Amino acid sequence: MNYYSAPIAKLIDEFSKLPGIGRKTAQRLAFHVISMGYEDAEKLSNSIIEAKKSIKYCRICTNLTDKEVCNICSDPNRKKSVICVIEDPRDVVAMERTREFKGQYHVLHGAISPLEGIGPEEINIKELLIRLQEHPVEEVILAMNPNIEGEATAMYIGKLLKPIGIKVSRIAHGIPVGGDLEYADEVTLSKALEGRREI
C-alpha cells in the first residue's frame, strides 16, 4: 500500500536510485526537499541539470571537467613526466587532498571485473596507451583500489607497460584491502604514494 501521493512517491523512488541511499534515507531527503522554499528547491534542481549538461570528460586524462581540458592537465606547473592512473574521478580529489602528487592523472572510470562483465575494453586503458605513445612519460603510478578488481587492473596495465620501458610503480598499501581511495585520509594516501613500489 502506498501512503504517499504520486509526486512524493516518485521523488522517493528517484532518490532511492542513488548509490548508498536506502528507502528510509530517500524518504527523509524527499520530505526535506518538499519542506524547502521553492527558490531553494529550484536552485537544487537547476544545479543538477547544469552539472549534467556541462560536465564532460577531459580530452587528455578523462577526468570530469566543464572544459575541453581539465585544470590539472592545463596547469603548466604539473609534472607531465609522471602519470597516476586511478579508477574514478573521486580518486583524483582524494589524491589532490594529499598535496603530495605533482604529476598528472589518467582516470580509467572503472576496474577490470570479469564477474561483472567489465574487461579491459570497458575502461579507459586504450586511451592511456594512446596517450603514452603520443606523449611518453618517465613513470606511471598505478593507484587502483586495494581490492581484487584493483589488483587485477594494476597487474594488467603493468604487463602492458613493462615492455615499453616505462617505470611502473604501485602505491603502497597503507590503504586497507577492500577499501576505496576516496575514503582514505590525506596522511594515509601521502604515505601510500611515498611508499609506492616498482612492478
Curated annotation (Swiss-Prot):
Q: Where are the zinc fingers (C4-type)?
A: 58-73
Which Pfam families is this protein grouped with? RecR_C, RecR_HhH, RecR_ZnF, Toprim_4
GO MF, one annotated term? DNA binding
Q: Which GO terms describe its biological process?
A: DNA recombination; DNA repair
Q: Which UniProt keywords apply?
A: DNA damage, DNA recombination, DNA repair, Metal-binding, Zinc, Zinc-finger
Superkingdom per UniProt: Bacteria
Keyword Disulfide bond listed? The answer is no
The UniProt record lists the Toprim domain at 81-176
The family annotation for this protein states: Belongs to the RecR family.
What does the UniProt record say this protein does? May play a role in DNA repair. It seems to be involved in an RecBC-independent recombinational process of DNA repair. It may act with RecF and RecO.
- According to UniProt, the name of this protein is Recombination protein RecR
Organism listed in the record: Alkaliphilus metalliredigens (strain QYMF)
